[in-house]
Amino acid sequence: MAESHLQSSLITASQFFEIWLHFDADGSGYLEGKELQNLIQELQQARKKAGLELSPEMKTFVDQYGQRDDGKIGIVELAHVLPTEENFLLLFRCQQLKSCEEFMKTWRKYDTDHSGFIETEELKNFLKDLLEKANKTVDDTKLAEYTDLMLKLFDSNNDGKLELTEMARLLPVQENFLLKFQGVKMCGKEFNKAFELYDQDGNGYIDENELDALLKDLCEKNKQDLDINNIPTYKKSIMALSDGGKLYRTDLALILSAGDN
C-alpha cells in the first residue's frame, strides 16, 4: 500500500495518513533511526520501480537525511517532501505554525476555556481558519475529513481531543521547543511546589520576571535538555499562553506538568 502511494503524482490526505502510519512503527509521532532510513529506502525504490525521478524536494530530503543516524522528522517535514494535495499541505505551511510563539497564541485563541485541550469542533474551526487565511475554502465534507485525519495523526492517547503537546506536532521539529521540555516535566505535586516557589508575591500567577527565574533554574538543572541561551525564546513562547502577562497555574502546567503521578 505504501509503495503505490509513494509512486503517486498526487497524494491525498488519507493516503498521506496511511504512509505515515506505515513508517511510524513505534507510534511516537516522529520518524527517526531505522524508521527514517526505511522511508528513504522505500521512497527511492518505489519511484525507481515506477520509472519516476525523485522530485527536487525528495532529492533534498534524501541528501539531508540519507547518511545520518541522528535524523528526526515530524509530520510537517514529510508533508513538504511528498506531493500532497494542496489544501491539506497548506495546513502545514500557514503563518500560525511558523514559530512556537505564534502557535501558542493560536492555541490560546481556541482553548478558550483553558481546559488544556482542543476538541473536535474547536479543531475544525481552527483548520477552517487556517485555510481561510491562505485564501482557500473547502466544503464541509472535506473539512470533516481533514479534522478526522488530524485527530488520527496527532491524538496519541485516542481521547478524541488534542493536548498542547499533541497539537504542537503541527510545528516543524526544529521549531517545537515543547520537545525540549518533555524531559523536564514534573509530577503534579512537584509542579505545584515549584509554582508556589516562583510565584514570589503569592498572587496566583507568574509574571515574566518570575518565569525568567524559573527557566534559569530549570536550564541549570537540565543542561542536556535545555539551553540557557534560548531562555528568551522559551519565555516568549510560554508567555504567549498568558492572560495579559499573567501566567496562571493551568497554563504553565501545559508545559511543565506531567500530571498527578
Curated annotation (Swiss-Prot):
> Which GO MF terms are attached to this record?
calcium ion binding; calcium ion binding involved in regulation of postsynaptic cytosolic calcium ion concentration; calcium ion binding involved in regulation of presynaptic cytosolic calcium ion concentration; vitamin D binding; zinc ion binding
In the record, which positions carry N-acetylalanine? A2
Gene Ontology CC: cytosol; dendrite; GABA-ergic synapse; glutamatergic synapse; hippocampal mossy fiber to CA3 synapse; neuronal cell body; nucleus; postsynapse
Give the residues the record marks as binding Ca(2+) 1. Answer: D24, D26, S28, Y30, E35
- One Pfam family name is EF-hand_1
Give residue ranges for domain EF-hand: 11-46, 53-88, 98-133, 142-177, 186-221, 226-251
- Which BP terms from GO are recorded? locomotory behavior; long-term memory; metanephric collecting duct development; metanephric connecting tubule development; metanephric distal convoluted tubule development; metanephric part of ureteric bud development; retina layer formation; short-term memory
Task: Please list where the region (Interaction with RANBP9) is annotated.
Answer: 2-7
Family, as annotated = Belongs to the calbindin family.
Q: How does it assemble?
A: Interacts with RANBP9.
This chain's protein is named: Calbindin
This protein's species is Bos taurus (Bovine)
Its gene? CALB1
